[in-house]
Structure formats: C-alpha cells, structure tokens
Amino acid sequence: MSYVIAAPEALVAAATDLATLGSTIGAANAAAAGSTTALLTAGADEVSAAIAAYSECTARPIRHSVRGRRRSMSGSCRPWPQVGAPMRPPRPPASRRCRARSIC
C-alpha cells in the first residue's frame, strides 16, 4: 500500500519557483536571440569568398577534362600569395657535413 503526504504550502512554493525559473529562461532566450541571429552565415565573409574563388579555379580544369574540352585557363585565376620567408633547404646528413668541412 502506498501513502502520499503532500503539504500544500510546499507544492505552492515549488510551483512558484518553477514559474520563476521558466520566466528567467525565457528572458535569457530572448536576450540571446538577438546576438545569435545577427551572425554572418558561412560564405558571407572575405575568407570564404577567396576560398570559393580558389576552389573554382582549381576545379575548372577537372570540369573541362570531364567534358572532353581542352580550354586554357583564363587570367582570373591566380596562385595563393606567398606568406613569410621561403623555407630554408634541409640540412645534409651528418656524415656529409663532416666530409664537407674536412675536419673528420
């Protein structure tokens, strides 16, 4: 046999707390909706535009070969700019360095 003991004051207090919590969450949702809907969508910035243009340039020869056409690339495609200094050449193996210095 089950027994249920309920205090009306406790139930009223719990319901009030839940209503307050619900209104707080609703206010937070409304406050966050403005800042999240104003974000740029993917592809609406300069970086995405540059990547799309580069992808178009690299996909163009593949598309032409699939279609069976041999067209020259238009002058609109440019390689990515070099950033920073060029890499230095790799060092030769240790035995080679030793002979080159004639110290061994």
Swiss-Prot record:
Gene3D superfamilies: HP0062-like domain. SUPFAM superfamilies: PE/PPE dimer-like (SSF140459). Residues 94-104 have a biased composition (Basic residues). Residues 64-104 are annotated as: Disordered. Belongs to the mycobacterial PE family. PGRS subfamily. Binds fibronectin. May contribute to pathogenicity. This is PE-PGRS family protein PE_PGRS60. It comes from Mycobacterium tuberculosis (strain ATCC 25618 / H37Rv).
